[in-house]
Amino acid sequence: MNYNEYQKALAAINKSAKRELDDLQGRMYEVQRMKDDKVISEKEAFERDQKLAEIFDSVKNRYARSAERLKMNFAKQDCDIKVGDIIWAVSKGAAKVLKIETIKLAAFDYPMLKLFGTQLTLYGQPYKKQLQHPKGGIYQKDITSINGEPYTYKTRV
């Protein structure tokens, strides 16, 4: 699963959760309307509201667990880049080849690489991993994860 697939799966979970929770909220409003129109008693309205609130909480928790499980599965994948890999980056038109010595990560945060003793934050241009093509030559691949954490590039504001 790449980062785009992860984002799509997360969006699908969120969409399903929103649809189900909106339906439950609609049912809660319906109970309130019936109570206001004196179709059902206060006691019955309270009991129905209580039941719907419990269902609402359980649905919300179920989708939160699904999203957390998806996040953990994505993070456990083999990563694109490891210590010792060679990457290159284009910075102001000049390509730089960098060897990764250590990688420090905060979970699902923008990673920081220690390169030749200096700190380099991966902001700005997307970094690429140099790969040796089986038929000879070198080609580049966008880095989507570093030590299992998703990596997207972002310009510092």
Residue ranges and their predicted role:
Residues 1, 76, 80-81, 149, ...:
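Short intrinsically disordered terminal tails
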Residues 1-25:
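Short, charge/polar-rich alpha-helical segments
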Residues 14, 18, 38-39, 78-80, ...:
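Short, flexible coil/linker elements and helix-boundary hinge sites characteristic
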Residues 16-53:
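Extended alpha-helical coiled-coil "stalk/arm" regions
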Residues 48-83:
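Mixed-charge, Lys/Arg-rich low-complexity intrinsically disordered regions
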Residues 65-69, 118-157:
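Intrinsically disordered, low-complexity, charged/polar segments
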Residues 91-131:
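Basic/aromatic-rich interaction segments and small domains that mediate binding to polyanionic partners
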